[in-house]
UniProtKB/Swiss-Prot annotation:
PROSITE patterns from the UniProt entry: PYRIDOX_OXIDASE
Catalytic EC class: oxidoreductase
InterPro entries, alphabetized: Pyridox_Oxase, Pyridox_Oxase_CS, Pyridox_Oxase_N, Pyridoxamine_oxidase_dimer_C, Split_barrel_FMN-bd
Name of this chain's protein: Pyridoxine/pyridoxamine 5'-phosphate oxidase
Free-text remark on how the cofactor is bound: Binds 1 FMN per subunit.
Record-stated family: Belongs to the pyridoxamine 5'-phosphate oxidase family.
EC nos: 1.4.3.5
Domain of life: Bacteria
Keywords for the protein's UniProt record, in alphabetical order: Flavoprotein, FMN, Oxidoreductase, Pyridoxine biosynthesis
Amino acid sequence: MSHSPLSSSIADLRKSYERAELSEDASHADPLLQFDQWLREAIAAQVPEPNAMTVATVGSDLRPSTRVVLIKGYDAQGIVWYTNYDSRKGRQIAGNPYAALQFHWVELERVVRIEGVVEKVSEAESDAYFHSRPLDSRIGAWASPQSQVIPSRGMLVANAAKYGAQFLLKPPRPPHWGGFRLRPDQWEFWQGRKSRLHDRLRYRLEDGTWERERLAP
């Protein structure tokens, strides 16, 4: 069965964004508080995986790459997630610590973009989070050589069985696994609006103070 190209029908896919607005008067002066409010609203609205975010990094070859991870914490110090340090993103961050994050809550017609410098969290933080994970996930951190080419899924299954037997119920945190923290120096909050006249508020860190400004859509 042949299929016709979707290019023409894709070009016609569009919707009008009319759920909400974002004004300077109604937004927080501190972008972290604005993010906290929007994340809470996404959770309350039962948005699927509201904690999922895209992480964009750039390698030494200047080629950007993205992937979706789950945020595991946020405070005045930054945004935290956990991963394999030997993964592609881990290697890219080691060579270039600048990265960008994006949350897209489709149901609320909202996007949050965050830029800044990434650093590793402390060993104690990584240990605490690792040991809070389900056992299968802790074994998986040992079993998967993330981002490396493998011969088959069977290798992962065999590795999981091997490390499960080796560590029983108490696997330690792998030395190649831990947390990253992005320290923001720029935030952008995007709220879809009618006629493509969307609201965009950007916060830039200037001499320790957040400067808020409106961007054209």
